Amino acid sequence: MLIEDAVSSGTPQFVIDSYATLAERAKTQSFGLIEEDVIVLDTETTGLSVQDNELIEISAARLSGREVVDRFDTFVHPKQLISAEITELTSITNADVADAPSAVEAVAALADFVGGCPVIAHNATFDRSFIESVKGGVNVSDIWIDSLALSRIALPRLASHKLSFMADLFGCDSVSHRANADVDALCGVCLLYTSD
């Protein structure tokens, strides 16, 4: 996909040129907050409602500067069965989660992994609400950064701010509706937001 096709009509040429070189510049730029360790996180759930659905996968990466220095990946054993629709979307089956830790155990392990670092998630309100609905989930992090909101500020002329769209456009890892692949894509996209 060409940058010209991915921006809103009427976008000035200098903005298009800036977006076109963004991925290359992100490899060499100096960053602010991103130079500190941050946790890039994604979850998969049995549905969209925090009241009616549950976590089934949590993935996170510790990003230090431009490098992923540690990973956290776990399935989560839900109390309800995973529907065929969710299995089709995520490829996560009931067999995958059968011996997985409970949500309380998984979120406690996540809190240990995060260790007080800021957490970045695409549409962070969704992931945070599921994490914090679990006992002990409020202890995961005090700082949650929504990369969706950040992309709308940093790249306002993009036609879409979906993670899959941006990952494809800027040559980051692909998005697959699996938490670990989405974390890989988001790590790449996060570096784009903060380049000069």
Can you annotate each of these PLM segments?
Residues 4-5, 10-143, 156-177:
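Conserved non-catalytic scaffold segment of RNase H-like nuclease domains
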Residues 115, 191-192:
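Non-catalytic alpha-helical coupling and interface elements of nucleotide-dependent molecular machines
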